[in-house]
């Protein structure tokens, strides 16, 4: 196998997106389009990967980091001009170069690997990735000769009646002999209506020099979808969503309603987990086996242990242990660590808190900037008062603590192991171990007060 290189074209402005966001950074199933392409291309055993950037170059470089080298196309003068920007990095290399657009998020490593192998086995100087479609209007047609090699690529507007009947189309993805590619780029002319340098002209140049130009036809036309506007973006989203859901179901995950379930491409879900409708799983979330998620639940960049149930709730950037029950209508905010066999009930919000094994907050509580021990019971309406208008303060609750209903813990404060806090208390000082703390006004009953008040009003 020869050395392999790839050039990703990601310099276009994307005017038809009508967006402030650079086109290739628009997400599909939670991941930028160009990141999808890079993730797949990176599986091909490349020696070098070059991404050609233009508009929004800094943001694309920030997204991709050091997985790619970058070449700048400061002025967009066509696809051949874009590839030529990578000359300083690749022109002297021996091997095969894949050229692909950064707005094709559905392309898979398997299809690109098949294209590369076909190219190498055919002994071609260039190979075009093609597809067969029943309605090819608007696409460039592949005209083959009697040997099955590519004779030319004809744009729809330039095709004659015979060529218009061809249903094999150019997808815009190519393989080239690297040296032949960069030698040909210098020969491409911009003598056309747009005054731009087009990559398909390299095919004509190589063909004219007597080189073999081959074509590899993929069975998966959907993979070649280029996203140029919001309509195509939504189409890519649906296709990717279905692909991700199918993969999870094949791997043993039950998805009750795949059409109403949204799972990130980077999410990992264990077998025998059930996903209910309206669930959104984002980022690099990891969910264990035998879990029940949803309905109407959002989980982002979090780790969920085996056997955990999360209903009608939101979990962000947190870790939840095994056999935990969350919801309905709970909110686990970033930097929270929930232990095993924990109960986080309805209308409970937890933020930046370590919540120990076996502890419970079953209803109507806010727990923020806290450290909760094991086997703690937080009664209905328990609140950690963590903010004084300027700074956040920590609440520490030891093991086996019982907090009565409607209690306020004014941080910084510590309730030591085994202590009890009476219902309705506002705790402003530390509570010793095993102590009962009562911090509320003493009840006063005024006998016959109501009758006296009403008689007084009548008189």
From Swiss-Prot:
Cross-referenced Pfam families: Hexapep, NTP_transferase
GO process terms (BP): cell morphogenesis; cell wall organization; lipid A biosynthetic process; peptidoglycan biosynthetic process; regulation of cell shape; UDP-N-acetylglucosamine biosynthetic process
Catalytic residues as annotated in Swiss-Prot or TrEMBL: 363 (proton acceptor)
Alphabetical list of Gene3D superfamilies matching this protein: Hexapeptide repeat proteins (2.160.10.10), Spore Coat Polysaccharide Biosynthesis Protein SpsA, Chain A (3.90.550.10)
Residues given in the record as UDP-N-acetyl-alpha-D-glucosamine binding sites: 9-12, 23, 73, 78-79, 140, 155, 170, 228, 333, 351, 366, 377
Membrane-spanning segments: none
Molecular function per GO: glucosamine-1-phosphate N-acetyltransferase activity; magnesium ion binding; UDP-N-acetylglucosamine diphosphorylase activity
Annotated PROSITE patterns: HEXAPEP_TRANSFERASES
Cofactor annotation: Mg(2+)
Nucleus is among the record's keywords: no
Binding site for acetyl-CoA: 386-387, 423, 440
Listed InterPro entries: Bifunctional_GlmU, GlmU-like, GlmU_C_LbH, Hexapep, Hexapep_transf_CS, NTP_transferase_dom, Nucleotide-diphossugar_trans, Trimer_LpxA-like_sf
Keywords tagged on the record: Acyltransferase, Cell shape, Cell wall biogenesis/degradation, Cytoplasm, Magnesium, Metal-binding, Multifunctional enzyme, Nucleotidyltransferase, Peptidoglycan synthesis, Repeat, Transferase
Pyrophosphorylase: annotated segments: 1-230
Single GO cellular component term: cytoplasm
Binding-site residues for Mg(2+), renumbered to this chain: 103, 228
Entry's localization field: Cytoplasm
Enzyme class: transferase
Free-text cofactor note: Binds 1 Mg(2+) ion per subunit.
Stretches for region Linker: 231-251
Function statement: Catalyzes the last two sequential reactions in the de novo biosynthetic pathway for UDP-N-acetylglucosamine (UDP-GlcNAc). The C-terminal domain catalyzes the transfer of acetyl group from acetyl coenzyme A to glucosamine-1-phosphate (GlcN-1-P) to produce N-acetylglucosamine-1-phosphate (GlcNAc-1-P), which is converted into UDP-GlcNAc by the transfer of uridine 5-monophosphate (from uridine 5-triphosphate), a reaction catalyzed by the N-terminal domain.
Sequence similarity: In the N-terminal section; belongs to the N-acetylglucosamine-1-phosphate uridyltransferase family. In the C-terminal section; belongs to the transferase hexapeptide repeat family.
Entries under NCBIfam families matching the protein: glmU, PRK14354.1
Protein name as it appears in the record: Bifunctional protein GlmU
Organism: Bacillus cytotoxicus (strain DSM 22905 / CIP 110041 / 391-98 / NVH 391-98)
